[in-house]
């Protein structure tokens, strides 16, 4: 369906959709800290940045209202923004307004990394390369795709237990992705 519409179904596109649902369930991760007014700002919208590797360095285009878009729409927009970033055609307003970001190094490789939270955001998720690993299930080894995820977050707002629940929710949604995405 996605490919017929001109998009490409990627892990990042799936994570955008699933993470938007997680941000609705865990609103602290979709907030920011306003140091001037000394308050927490809970966003009523979900705008997500996606790190794109370019020859000029990392750029983070923002997809607006992720929670209101289909997986097909997200796949197409992600591809268009990434291409604009790589071809130096991205506009400044397309790099602003994100509340949460995803950085996917899977195409480069590696097993884990720690992304840095971009202020005023309070969290960012890192995605490493997926692998197929043997997992012991019901008395036998079965092949399972493993996707290493990492989460960096601001402890002034989010504690470790909340972060673990947030990331666990995303993992469970990925395991049941056909139910949550379409």
What do these predicted ranges mean?
Residues 1-182:
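C-terminal catalytic/motor cores of large multi-domain enzyme assemblies
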